[in-house]
Amino acid sequence: MKKTIWMALIMLSGVIVSAAQPKFTQKELAYLPATAQVALFKAGIITPSDVLEAQIAQVQKYNGSYNTELRDLGKELNTFNAGKINAICFDRFAEARKAAKAAEERYRNGTARRLEGVTVGVKNENNVIGWRVDMGSLLLKDVPPCTDDTPIIERLKNEGAILVFSTTVPELYVNCMTWSRLYGITRNPWNLAYGVGGSSGGSGAALAAGFCTIATGSDMGGSIRLPASMNGVYGFKPPFGRVPTSEISYETLGPLTRTFDDLVLMQDIIAGPHPKNHSSLRPKLDYPERYRPLKGAKVAVCYCNQWLDGGCDKEVNEALDKVAAALKKAGAEVKIIKSDWSVQNGEMKTFVAGLLSTEMYELFDAITSANKNLLCANLVPLLTNISGYNPKALIKATQMGMAAHADVQKEIFEDGCIALIMPTLATPFVAPAYQATPEDIAVVNGKSFISNDILLTPVWNLLNRYPVVDMPVMLSSKRVPIGVQIVGNTFDDLAAFRVAAGLSKVIPQMYTGDRFPDFREQK
């Protein structure tokens, strides 16, 4: 308690009393938020090397080995790194140690930048000069190193961040959990019997395990929000164009962090127009550190039980109950809605066909002539329907999105609500190698699922001008976290951030007290 109060005083006042300086344990250093780290670095209490070494120790203890030979793990899927997190493709710890020493010099000479010395896990999708981006696929294991930086990587580097490792992804980013024949299964630090979400699952798991301080993600069907929810971290799917990404309107890059304040900091750094990306929005939106209280605001809450045959898991409903109560405690008016503008069931196929009829088609068309025996099992059905990915499919998906947009506007935002809160997925209890075999399933209220219908995220990629914050709200009975989506109106990022900020003050936060992963394995 004394240490917590002391840290708060450091961060708020900048007053340092050297006699009161506490020692930090390895775990405390590994899980320190970026905002706290920077304050303590500036004060000379700890150094970037202290945090880096603590996080490397976490990796060595909990991650397991790397598949450095890039061999096919298909027959070893369940045994490779069994009992470990397995969230890292490869590390760059030698370079990181040098960067940490350079950061310490900047703190000494007063030239430290906003993320000086803060460690970043990089999704195996973002270009980093000299790093390999193989998309988790055996087909691409011999890809040459990158010769340029993705814009968000460029911006993180320019603010002094230290890139420490590449995080695991499902093959070609096409799975809601994270496993591949190239890197194996990534498991949940809160409970290794369950999945971490996807496709930014390695980033989410690395944060939860204390391997890094912040991490990059991307989202074209829920790939930031699913890992955020299942790993108990914050994630943000910005509206299309807010962060320079690709020209695929379903997709966006975004931040993953353990705290709301770190989410604000990272998003403010990576947002804004960039000459490499003509769809990036101008001018840059600035994200303030503080937000107005929720008193008097009207917020819609949808439990989404009507979106899925049999409804959502009872613990997901319990999480929404907690959110509704927290909103009222914060002084907000709550509007419960029961509308269904989902993309579940048959409409999920329309969404997927629309997505794969964008620039994604070129990728899938190219691999149809590749060795399909090297592909993960879940990808093969997508390739058998390649002729169905065409302009007509894209138009059909667009029309479905326009109808959903009209419904959302009428029921939520035209009625005075500043945001909508809804679940991220129908259950937190999903097999870590979901869809690898008929046994790798999810069970919701006694019903078995192996489809993407358990996901409640894709509608906001179809409607990708809506910003969505995903924040953790409770631990389930099996200690797998449950998060919710906070959806602002089109391009109204700050409304979603305002609601997340308000809830973060009244809902007990992860990575405080006894709310840390214990790396159990319990079904």
Regions found by a protein language model. Give the residues of each.
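Short helix-loop capping/hinge segments that flank enzyme active sites or metal/cofactor-binding pockets
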Residues: G110, L115-K141, P293-C304, A353-K410, ...
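Glycine-rich, small-residue loops and helix-cap segments
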Residues: G44, G117, K123, N158, ...
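Short glycine/serine-rich loop segments
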Residues: D148-T150, E154-A271, L463-G483
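Short, solvent-exposed turn/loop segments enriched in Gly/Ser/Thr/Pro and often Arg
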Residues: T167-N175, W341-Q344, L425-A426
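Short, well-ordered alpha-helical
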Residues: Q21-D142, Y173-N175, T512-K523
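Bacterial Sec-dependent N-terminal signal peptides
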Residues: M1-Q21
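Acyltransferase
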Residues: I45-P48, L52-E53, K101, T150, ...
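A short helix-breaking turn/cap at a secondary-structure junction
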Residues: Y234-D321, I507-K523
